[in-house]
A protein has these predicted regions:
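N-terminal ligand-binding/catalytic initiation module
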Residues: 1-158
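Acidic, His- and aromatic-enriched active-site or binding-groove loops in soluble protein domains
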Residues: 163
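Conserved small/polar residues in nucleotide/adenosyl-binding loops
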Residues: 252-255
């Protein structure tokens, strides 16, 4: 991995126009006619078409190519709960990746709300603007509830990147690695060092590919997650092992 200094990173974000993303027009705007089509009076016609048929928004606006990257800053990369505004550079960075690799337009939205219900309400109210929602850097277990609720209440795709993006990439790596060494995915034993959103989602996808639940050992900050431990959330309970002989990753006990 390339080593990046603090000075270089700050200079990158500060130089020229601060930040990493911007909005650019996609239609002509040089003449009075252009502006009259883009705004008043011409803009009234697509508005009325959308009023008659909401799906027309995909024909006359950028809705279909516009994704909201939304976070409350409670689990930002390796920084933890640093707050919504502090996470903005990460959300802009994700917007940059959407654009350069997928041609998808992004608005980064930082919501200063930790309560899952209120956070969902905020997203639901702005959802008509977008063709998709990318949830980003929201801590577990709240992120599981938020994603499931928004999938139920919204009529556009909802993805929690820390769960599903990570899971897809790591599952591809696992599948290819097992193919290279000639091992059956149904017979391998898997140790998952972590029990946050990414780890939970990754492990569920590994199981969908064939990893057997009884062959999984998952750890969190307190050690191996066992079924006799109190205070586990529902996600951790699902992966808790019934083994009573193992609480750490001592080689002898794992073997």
């Amino acid at each position: 991995m390339v080593k990046i200094s603090k000075e270089a990173a700050l200079e990158y974000h500060e130089s020229g126009r601060p930040g990493k993303i911007e909005v650019k027009p996609t239609k002509a705007y040089r003449t009075q006619t252009d502006l009259s089509l883009a705004y008043s009076p011409g803009v009234a016609y697509p508005c009325l078409e959308i009023q008659d048929n909401p799906d027309a928004a995909y024909r006359y606006t950028d809705k279909g190519n516009l994704v909201a990257v939304i976070s409350n800053g409670t689990a930002v990369l390796g920084l933890g709960d640093i707050g919504a505004m502090s996470g903005k550079p990460v959300m802009e960075g994700k917007g940059l990746l959407f654009k350069i690799y997928g041609g998808i337009d992004v608005f980064d939205i930082e919501v200063n709300e930790k309560d899952p219900e209120k956070f969902c309400e905020a997203v639901e109210k702005i959802a008509p603007t977008f063709g998709g929602i990318n949830l980003e850097d929201i801590k577990a277990p709240e992120c599981f509830y938020i994603e499931e609720r928004l999938k139920r209440t919204l009529d556009i795709p909802v993805m929690h990147d820390d769960q599903h993006g990570t899971a897809i990439i790591s599952a591809a790596g696992l599948k290819n690695a097992l193919e290279v060494i000639g091992k059956d995915i149904k017979k391998v034993r898997l140790v998952v060092n972590g029990a946050g959103a990414a780890a939970i989602s990754c492990t569920k996808l590994y199981m969908a590919l064939g990893v057997q639940k009884e062959n999984i050992l998952m750890l969190d900050s307190k050690g191996v997650i066992t079924s006799d431990r109190e205070g586990l959330n529902e996600q951790k309970k699902f992966f808790a092992t019934d083994r009573r002989d193992i609480h750490t990753l001592d080689r002898k006990s794992v073997v």
